[in-house]
Amino acid sequence: MAKLEITLKRSLIGRPQPQRRTVQALGLGKTNSVVVKEDNPAIRGMITKVSHLVDVKEV
């Protein structure tokens, strides 16, 4: 299965609580933090919810 490299590109200041929780569930903390996750429907759904805050690359 493919892996996704997810980078938090925008700050969470002023963002609604559900978006903050989604970013936290992805394992991202500060701006420009990077995580590598398996590509599955659950992760894709979370990325869709915060697509305006993150940058995604396939590894």
UniProtKB/Swiss-Prot annotation:
<keyword id="KW-0687">Ribonucleoprotein</keyword>
<dbReference type="GO" id="GO:0006412">
    <property type="term" value="P:translation"/>
</dbReference>
<comment type="similarity">
    <text>Belongs to the universal ribosomal protein uL30 family.</text>
</comment>
<keyword id="KW-0689">Ribosomal protein</keyword>
<protein>
    <recommendedName>
        <fullName>Large ribosomal subunit protein uL30</fullName>
    </recommendedName>
</protein>
<dbReference type="Pfam" id="PF00327">
    <property type="entry name" value="Ribosomal_L30"/>
</dbReference>
<dbReference type="GO" id="GO:0003735">
    <property type="term" value="F:structural constituent of ribosome"/>
</dbReference>
<comment type="subunit">
    <text>Part of the 50S ribosomal subunit.</text>
</comment>
<dbReference type="GO" id="GO:0022625">
    <property type="term" value="C:cytosolic large ribosomal subunit"/>
</dbReference>
<dbReference type="InterPro" id="IPR036919">
    <property type="entry name" value="Ribo_uL30_ferredoxin-like_sf"/>
</dbReference>
<dbReference type="InterPro" id="IPR018038">
    <property type="entry name" value="Ribosomal_uL30_CS"/>
</dbReference>
<dbReference type="InterPro" id="IPR016082">
    <property type="entry name" value="Ribosomal_uL30_ferredoxin-like"/>
</dbReference>
<dbReference type="InterPro" id="IPR005996">
    <property type="entry name" value="Ribosomal_uL30_bac-type"/>
</dbReference>
